Amino acid sequence: MRIGFLSHAGASIYHFRMPIIKALKDRKDEVFVIVPQDEYTQKLRDLGLKVIVYEFSRASLNPFVVLKNFFYLAKVLKNLNLDFIQSAAHKSNTFGILAAKWAKIPYRFALVEGLGSFYIDQGFKANLVRFVINSLYKLSFKFAHQFIFVNESNAEFMRNLGLKENKICVIKSVGINLKKFFPIYVESEKKELFWKNLNIDKKPIVLMIARALWHKGVKEFYESATMLKDKANFVLVGGRDENPSCASLEFLNSGAVHYLGARSDIVELLQNCDIFVLPSYKEGFPVSVLEAKACGKAIVVSDCEGCVEAISNAYDGLWAKTKNAKDLSEKISLLLEDEKLRLNLAKNAAQDALQYDENIIAQRYLKLYDRVIKNV
């Protein structure tokens, strides 16, 4: 079969779709990656993928620009003569599915990995964008054969918008690489070197990995660090850009948190930390939490959508109240003080992470594709 993976960003394909693509190629399907030109385009080609570039204005709400992008994409898809397409993210799941229908692609799948910042933010623009997105989804419901969700909350949201039950499938997580993320014992000499390289005190490390967005809980993390600075090192890893949803560099470089920016040594950071924290306001199914679990770390997450499906409270981590720095600091403090609890949660976390092996998840996708195609 000729299969297309459609995304508004090459990074999404590169980091999250490769296990599924590999599984499809292993069974001799022909796979095309359809993305805008960006810094990941060549990386995808270097992996031996057939990359098709299309025009896309990611931030534009101009209807004329959107229509131009739509018809260009529809033409690209029609020329590819695909048997089925897998989209992901709002614009691909709406305009992309509509373009795929126009291009007469027989089977159309949409993946919802989370609702995003517009479903957290308030104000006229956020409300308007939500209304537009919801309206477009209602239209795309008619033309997608299956919507795949990474959590039950998002599935319920779309169900309430009018998505029929027979078009809903929940596959939790996009999977993680367990050959890369696994528990290890860090010898004292290596931990000493790690402290030295980060230029931090010899105290337990509380790590947060996320883009420096306010709705990821950056404010609460910094406030907790201030409360617990004598007990632990608080480290934030994640990139930022210039938009109001991101914390400023001035904020990030102040306070009791060591802000490291974007890093490539995520495995080493996870294996050397003592506690992993994600105090987000809303998630899809957080990959960073699964990677921390796979490394055998005790975890604290906020009790928000997505996080509560990735962590079972008091089994493989703890829930803290969303947008509540005091409760977050209390949960972190509990783990710092109770080593037995911390180690027990970490052990359970590592065991639970096994079910999210990327190869297992990839096979679930393939079985879904085959089932839907057989029954359409």
Curated annotation (Swiss-Prot):
Catalytic activity: N,N'-diacetyl-alpha-D-bacillosaminyl-tri-trans,hepta-cis-undecaprenyl diphosphate + UDP-N-acetyl-alpha-D-galactosamine = N-acetyl-alpha-D-galactosaminyl-(1->3)-N,N'-diacetyl-alpha-D-bacillosaminyl-tri-trans,hepta-cis-undecaprenyl diphosphate + UDP + H(+)
BP term (GO), one: protein N-linked glycosylation via asparagine
Presence of the UniProt keyword Transferase in the record: yes
Record EC number: 2.4.1.290
Entry GO MF terms: hexosyltransferase activity; N,N'-diacetylbacillosaminyl-diphospho-undecaprenol alpha-1,3-N-acetylgalactosaminyltransferase activity
Enzyme class: transferase
Pathway membership: Protein modification; protein glycosylation
Protein function: Adds the first GalNAc residue on to the isoprenoid-linked bacillosamine (2,4-diacetamido-2,4,6-trideoxyglucose) carrier in the N-linked protein glycosylation pathway. Acts first on the undecaprenylpyrophosphate-linked bacillosamine (Und-PP-Bac) substrate to yield the disaccharide.
Family of this protein: Belongs to the glycosyltransferase group 1 family.
Miscellaneous field: N-linked protein glycosylation in C.jejuni consists in the transfer of a heptasaccharide (GalNAc-alpha1,4-GalNAc-alpha1,4-(Glcbeta1,3)-GalNAc-alpha1,4-GalNAc-alpha1,4-GalNAc-alpha1,3-bacillosamine) from a membrane-anchored undecaprenylpyrophosphate (Und-PP)-linked donor to the Asn side chain of proteins at the Asn-X-Ser/Thr motif.
The protein's name in its UniProt record: N,N'-diacetylbacillosaminyl-diphospho-undecaprenol alpha-1,3-N-acetylgalactosaminyltransferase
UniProt lineage: Bacteria, Pseudomonadati, Campylobacterota, Epsilonproteobacteria, Campylobacterales
